[in-house]
Structures are given as C-alpha cells and as structure tokens.
Amino acid sequence: MPKGFGSSVIDAPVDEVWERIRDFNGLPDWHPGIARSEIEDGRASDSIGAVRSLYLQDGEHVRETLLALSDLDRTQTYDMLKGPMAWWNYKATLRVLPITDGDRTYIEWSAEFDAKPEDEAGLIEFVEQGVFQGGFDALKKHFAGN
C-alpha cells in the first residue's frame, strides 16, 4: 500500500492553525486547489460520518467522509469515496502539534491508498507535492499576512 507524507512548520500558534484547518467543510478557505465544498445531507461539518463534496479548481468532483476528529489531539482523518485520481481505499490524516520554541506549529499530512504499481510513484508525488505541500504553502502565506 503506497503512502504519502508531508510535514512543515507554520509560524503561528498551534491553536490558530488548528482553528484554520479544523472545519471539514472549510478546505476552500485555505487550500488553493479547492474551489468549493458542501457537506451533504445537512449534517454538521464536525459530525463523524459527514460527507463533503469538494469541487476542485479544475472542475473535478471529489467526495470524502470524515472518519475522526479530535480537538484534544488536533487531528482529522478522512477517506475518499470518489475522485478523479487513479487510486482507491484512500485514507488521510491531517495533524498539528505545538512547537514550544517560538510558539510555532508542526503540521503533518499523511495518506495511504491502493493503486496500480505503475501509478504509485506519480500518485505519491502528486499527493505529497500537489495536495500536502500546496496546503502547507497556503497556510504559511496566510499566517505571514500575505
């Protein structure tokens, strides 16, 4: 099972970063690859089992389910039900931790999925550089005030 992983440091307190990324329906507010998001069936966005319909900037549609959300651990885990990517059984976790030296935040995003062997390397690069790093860069820019 291929795995993707990315991490970064955000120059902002962990509670502020968590507040920015916590909302399962709020991805368009901070990730440049997402045009809009809607929670299906009128559920609350922090309700385990909530399904979000994401519309990517290129018009593609993705559906994901919130599997776990912990304010104590500052983690969010979700899986992908539908999307244009050539993977299946996609499951990801986004987590933030405090860095006490300088009141900064360590952020990590990881995913595992199944894919055809010939597609694995390209999909890992896409998720690590396009999805994860794209999100980290946008968060850094936001908290830098740019």
Go through the PLM ranges and name each one:
Residues 10-12, 56, 115:
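Short beta-strand-to-loop capping motifs
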Residues 13, 59, 71-72, 99-102:
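Short strand-connecting beta-turns/loops that link adjacent beta-strands
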